[in-house]
A protein has these predicted regions:
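Short acidic-hydrophobic, aromatic-tinged amphipathic segments that line or gate anion-handling sites
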Residues: 2-9, 90
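N-terminal catalytic cores of NTP/NDP-binding nucleotidyl/phosphoryl-transfer enzymes
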Residues: 10-73
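Residue-level signal for inorganic ion chemistry
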Residues: 28, 81, 120, 180, ...
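Glycine-rich, highly charged phosphate/nucleotide-binding loops
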Residues: 69-77, 101-107
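A glycine-rich helix N-cap at a beta->alpha junction
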Residues: 73-89
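Classical nucleotidyltransferase
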Residues: 100-207, 289-293, 319
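Phosphate/ribose-recognition catalytic cores of enzymes acting on nucleotide-derived substrates
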Residues: 197-323
Length: 323
């Protein structure tokens, strides 16, 4: 896949493109379905296939106080897109100038003049342009003026439910990891930097890597204990682990912390980038009467997680299929 970063007014020598456009947060199964339609149409038409996306969430420009809760970082999104076998990913720099373009002007200046799009396949509910005020019929009419065929793709349904990033976020907020992963088509994965913590886990025999909550723009699932797979950004192998998200009530914590215990691992991780893939929620976070009671529960959690990997998911270390 070619990744091409685009700014307004730049010119590029490009072959004719069959494209789709969107933010594609998480590149979930609905997105994958849409992209497969683009690839099929490109092959039939003898053109290149393309995804047009943005370098930041549009609401980060349109709303100054907007705090994104993303399913995927830009780097992860591009990696996921590359796995669809799309030819090109065009990453538009989203700023106030781009946001001000009407759908007509966007199609004329960006799709037609810059990207040489000849066929545009849009999602069943996708709208673009300033204030997203135009309709699919408007896009079709504009396309006729510019030599762009505009096609609406069907919705992708699973169990009679439309797959969307919003539904996935709601599942994650509720701790429904398996449901979210089914809609994504892969285990939900976050990335953040490892920072120093309180060392409470180490004292109980369960040393943890603490993630920098503020450095991560991705959505954190509901508070609780999770079965996870973990790897360092620059490594290959995945390790089993258990993660706690919450306020550490046994220690009277008041702020959110995210910490993960890596199974069968020793070493210094501080300052490194860690990827965590969520497999299943094990239990809610509880306040225990003593450190001994908490340590005993953590031992049981670890045993349950290992059984889950062995007997239910049949996942071994180093083979999990994630971004």
């Amino acid at each position: 896949m070619n990744t091409i970063y685009i700014k307004q007014g730049e010119t590029h020598e490009l072959v004719e493109q069959v494209a789709t456009i969107g933010f594609f947060d998480g590149v979930h199964r609905g997105h994958q379905f849409l992209i497969s339609r683009v690839i099929d149409e490109a092959e039939r038409s003898g053109m290149a296939s393309a995804v047009i996306t943005f370098d930041r969430h549009p609401r980060q420009v349109l709303q100054a106080d907007y705090q994104p809760e993303l399913l995927s970082t830009l780097d992860e999104k591009l990696l996921l897109l590359s796995k669809t076998h799309i030819d090109n990913s065009f990453v538009l720099h989203f700023d106030a100038s781009l946001a001000a373009l009407s759908a007509h002007d966007f199609m004329q200046e960006v799709l037609c003049k810059q990207l040489n799009v000849k066929k545009l396949i849009i999602g069943y509910d996708n709208r673009f342009g300033h204030n997203r005020s135009e309709t699919f019929e408007d896009y079709v009419q504009y396309g006729k003026e510019m030599g762009i065929e505009v096609i609406r793709a069907d919705a992708f349904l699973t169990n009679d439910e439309k797959v969307s990033s919003s539904v996935i976020r709601n599942d994650l907020r509720a701790g429904n990891i398996e449901a979210a992963n089914r809609l994504l088509g892969y285990p939900y994965t976050i990335e953040s930097r490892i920072v120093s913590g309180y060392q409470n886990g180490r004292k109980m025999g369960f040393p943890t890597a603490n993630l920098d909550v503020n450095a991560c723009q991705q959505l954190f699932p509901a508070s609780g204990v999770y079965a996870v797979m973990v790897r360092l950004r620059d490594s290959v192998g995945w390790k089993r682990g258990m993660m706690n998200i919450g306020h550490r009530p046994t220690f009277n914590g008041t702020t959110t912390s995210i910490e993960v215990n890596l199974f069968n691992f020793t070493g210094d991780l501080y300052g490194q980038e860690l990827l965590v893939s969520f497999i299943s929620k094990i239990r809610d976070e509880h306040k225990f009467d003593s450190l001994e009671a908490l340590a005993q529960q953590l031992k049981q959690d670890k045993e349950q997680i290992n059984r889950l990997f062995d007997e239910t998911y049949h996942i071994q270390e180093n083979i999990i299929n994630t971004p």
